[in-house]
């Protein structure tokens, strides 16, 4: 039986921390979908098409990973993709409370949907897309935290 997992998020933009999680998930499951949420209420810097394109390029070295955009409830998207595993990254204890609420709601909406929590490697444990964008806005060097294509796109957006 083939295992299919979904790693959802806004990924505005995708960081090396996200790539760390997805790379490890790709070694655990037969197929992994990086599901990029439209998230219009978050007012993303990059639109959905841009985020999908950036992530697709950054993840092209992982043959069992597919990048898709979505705007539905996660449980509905998972059901439509016939996936029953949800990957979530936990950077710190503070993330756990919110992630636990999401996991319980997703389980309520789709009882067969299991949430699997992965901690990022120590090197990436403190970064987030929001933090990287904030540092970049103030001319800080974020090269180390982003794939090259994403770094270039971020610098273009900030011009």
Curated annotation (Swiss-Prot):
Gene3D superfamilies found in the cross-reference section: HUPs (3.40.50.620)
Main location: cytoplasm
Any one GO CC term of the record: cytoplasm
Key word Iron-sulfur present: no
Root EC class: transferase
Pathway noted in the entry: Cofactor biosynthesis; coenzyme A biosynthesis; CoA from (R)-pantothenate: step 4/5
Sites where the protein binds substrate: 10, 42, 74, 88
Residues engaged in binding ATP: 10-11, 18, 89-91, 99, 124-130
EC number from the UniProt entry: 2.7.7.3
Catalytic activity: (R)-4'-phosphopantetheine + ATP + H(+) = 3'-dephospho-CoA + diphosphate
GO biological process, any: coenzyme A biosynthetic process
Cofactor(s) required, per the database record: Mg(2+)
Pfam families: CTP_transf_like (PF01467)
PANTHER family: PHOSPHOPANTETHEINE ADENYLYLTRANSFERASE
HAMAP family: PPAT_bact (MF_00151)
Homology family: Belongs to the bacterial CoaD family.
Name the record gives this protein: Phosphopantetheine adenylyltransferase
Species in which this protein is naturally found: Enterobacter sp. (strain 638)
């Amino acid at each position: 039986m083939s295992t299919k997992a979904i790693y959802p998020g806004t990924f505005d933009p995708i960081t090396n921390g996200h790539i760390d999680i997805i790379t490890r998930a790709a070694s655990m499951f037969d197929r992994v979908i990086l599901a990029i949420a439209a998230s219009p209420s978050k007012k993303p810097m990059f639109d959905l098409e841009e985020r999908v394109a950036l992530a697709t390029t950054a993840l092209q070295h992982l043959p069992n990973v597919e990048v898709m955009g979505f705007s539905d409830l996660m449980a509905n998207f998972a059901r439509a993709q016939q996936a029953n595993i949800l990957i979530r990254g936990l950077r710190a204890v503070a993330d756990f409370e919110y992630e636990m609420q999401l996991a319980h709601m997703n389980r309520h909406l789709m009882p067969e949907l299991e949430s699997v929590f992965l901690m990022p490697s120590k090197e990436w444990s403190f970064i987030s897309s929001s933090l990287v964008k904030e540092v970049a806005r103030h001319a800080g060097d974020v090269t180390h935290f982003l794939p090259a294509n994403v770094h270039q796109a971020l610098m273009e957006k900030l011009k």
